Amino acid sequence: MTTTRVCIDSSVALKIVRHCQESAPSIVAGQLLGLDVDGELRISHAFAFPQNAAGGNPNSDDGLSLRLKAVAKYQPEMIDHLKEVNVDSNSVGWYQSTVLGRIYNASVIENLAVFQEKNPDSVVLVYDVAGSEVVSDTDPSSTGPQGHTTTTPSGFNLRAFRLSEEYLNVRKSGKFDTATLTENNLTYHDVLVELPVEIKNSNLATLLLYQLGQQYPNSPFAESSFSNLNVSVDPFLEKNIEAIFDSVDDFHYDQGNYNYYQRQMTREQAKITQWQQKRKAENAAREKDGRPALPTDEWKRLFKLPTEPSRQDNLLISAQLNEHCSVIEEFGAAVNSKLFATQGGLL
């Protein structure tokens, strides 16, 4: 992996946002095309996948299946057509919409692993429909001399992710047990690596925005933001709290399965210890009688230890729970300020 940041052409970003917004609440996806230039992944084009590539249910944890026959047939055909018009045809990942940051599911992880096997620099661009509110800002400082704007969680929620080296190493071993996770230092914090996202305008678009800013300067009324006076609790925050409850339920269910495995393991190990002590006593008696000792490893044939369940689900659920908590921590500060201001009669 050589790229450390993602740069998206503004027209591509608008195309992604429009596709995701118009298809909401259905979950949709599309192909990303671009190049790796000096450690920067430049995304210059994108096109949508067929609608049936999506699960359709925004509340489902199943995510998208990008290996359907319709997608497998449509993707190469579309790339061939783009080659004919000299568009970058190098696949650098895919984009998809989501609701409430639900990206930590087996489908997203598996799709990303397949993409990174073909191109280690591949990423997934995630646009959160529920957490995005695209705001227009004509302040010249927001575009800058290079025409750059950045994404913020409180507004334009477009984020780039890639699987970490630790996760790929564990996946390569084929074992998601506790020993393998510990050996590779993999925790729920390290499943995905988030890359900084930068949106770049072309020089002509930057010039146009500058001219419009000079021609229609902001008035004091246009700069006012009366939304700050709204004291109602953000519905987005409420939905995240509900999502936390769902994630906690999933976590308890998965933890219950693991606790059952541990009880079974403890029970079997107690039986093995008892058998070994008995065999040790038998060998001591046989030694006194001058008879050969019995083998001490027969317990491997007599007892079968339970197999540890995969810890992948636990990793993903924990990571998703942490994602919801981070959102609440970020948005909760603003909501608490409004509530305290209301209580103090300041609004």
Curated annotation (Swiss-Prot):
Protein name: Eukaryotic translation initiation factor 3 subunit H
HAMAP family: eIF3h
Pfam families registered for this protein in UniProt: eIF3h_C, JAB
Subunit-level organization: Component of the eukaryotic translation initiation factor 3 (eIF-3) complex.
Gene Ontology, cellular component aspect: eukaryotic 43S preinitiation complex; eukaryotic 48S preinitiation complex; eukaryotic translation initiation factor 3 complex
Segments of skewed composition (Polar residues): 138-155
Signal peptide positions on this chain: none
Gene Ontology annotations of biological process type: formation of cytoplasmic translation initiation complex; translational initiation
Subcellular location: Cytoplasm
Stretches assigned to the MPN domain: 6-149
Disordered: region residues: 136-155
Principal location: cytoplasm
